[in-house]
Structures are given as structure tokens and as C-alpha cells.
A protein has these predicted regions:
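Alpha-helix boundary/N-cap detector
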Residues: 1-8, 68, 72, 102-113, ...
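N-terminal "first-domain core" detector
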Residues: 1-43
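Short secondary-structure junctions and interdomain/linker hinges
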Residues: 17-24, 84, 125, 129
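Extended hydrophobic/Leu-rich segments
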Residues: 28-32, 47, 53, 103, ...
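Short aromatic-glycine-(Arg/Gly/Cys) micro-motifs in beta-strand/loop hairpins
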Residues: 33-61
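Short Cys/His-based metal-binding microdomains
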Residues: 59-64, 71
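Ampiphathic alpha-helical segments that act as solvent-exposed interaction surfaces
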Residues: 68-88
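Intrinsically disordered, low-complexity, charge-dense segments enriched in Lys/Arg
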Residues: 86-152
């Protein structure tokens, strides 16, 4: 497994979705090249035989998951990008007159509908994992193994 392989495969899968853009492709590169240092943003370091999926808060790693499975790495990135794109749609259509977003059941359902539509185009195993509601925070429970998540 290498970072370039993961980026190319993720990009190919996302190109199946009409909402994907060149800006999102740049974000994939940031996830893998270590320049994505904002709070609560996904980062991936691909080493020789495994990848480290992690999230930072104020420069400190607050969550880390290690895996040897390329499809888990790709799923983490797909989930992150699809979430960002769906948030854009939500902000464009579900804010009040003052510009505030209120997370109501309608907003949550709309976000889920967008994600479900996108993952249905990505195929398996990604679509199934999305149907199961697996997020990066659930990787240890869902994918098990000796790859323990770390919370700081």
C-alpha cells in the first residue's frame, strides 16, 4: 500500500459522483501529504505495510487508528470528503435568515440522503459500511483486530 495508490483509487471512486470537484481532489492530497493540520480534520500517513488514520486537535493527536487494509483507508477518506460536500449543500439550503444552521432532524436526514446517494455509486464494501453507519470513530469496534484506536 502506498499513499499515491490510495489517492488515485479514492479520486476514481469520487469521480463517479457528480458533486465531486477539483477542489475536493486538492483536499485528498492534503489528507495524505501531511499539510492538513486544522483541528478535527482527517489525516493519513501511509507507511510501508500499514497506514495511520488520525485526527488532530490543537496540534495534538486525539484519535489514531492503524490498518493494513487499503480499503479502510480509502473509506475513511471517502467518508470525510462526502461529509464535507454534503455540509456544503446543507449550508446552502438549511440556514435561517440570520445565516444560522440548526441541526434538526430534517438536516440530519438530508445529510444522510446525500451520503447514501454518493456511497451507492462507490460500490462495495464502501456502500455497505456506510449503510452500517461506520465512521472513523467506530473503526476499532467495526473492523476489530489488534489495531486499537488511541484517544489522548
Amino acid at each position: 500500500m502506498n499513499a499515491k495508490e490510495c489517492m488515485i483509487e479514492t479520486d476514481k471512486l469520487l469521480q463517479k459522483w457528480s458533486c465531486y470537484s477539483i477542489e475536493n481532489r486538492r483536499y485528498i492530497e492534503k489528507i495524505f501529504n501531511g499539510s492538513n493540520r486544522y483541528d478535527m480534520m482527517l489525516n493519513v500517513d501511509v507507511m510501508q505495510k500499514q497506514a495511520k488514520i488520525y485526527v488532530l486537535e490543537r496540534g495534538v493527536t486525539i484519535y489514531e487508528y492503524r490498518t493494513e487494509r487499503k480499503e479502510i483507508v480509502i473509506y475513511a477518506v471517502l467518508r470525510d470528503i462526502i461529509g464535507i460536500i454534503s455540509d456544503t449543500f446543507i449550508c446552502d439550503s438549511h440556514v435561517d435568515e440570520k445565516g444560522y444552521l440548526h441541526f434538526t432532524e430534517n438536516v440530519s436526514n438530508y445529510r444522510k440522503k446525500i451520503a447514501d446517494e454518493a456511497f451507492s455509486l462507490m460500490g462495495e464494501p464502501y456502500n455497505e459500511w456506510n449503510r452500517q453507519g461506520i465512521s472513523i470513530w467506530d473503526f476499532n469496534r467495526s473492523f476489530g483486530g489488534n489495531k486499537r484506536p488511541t484517544f489522548s
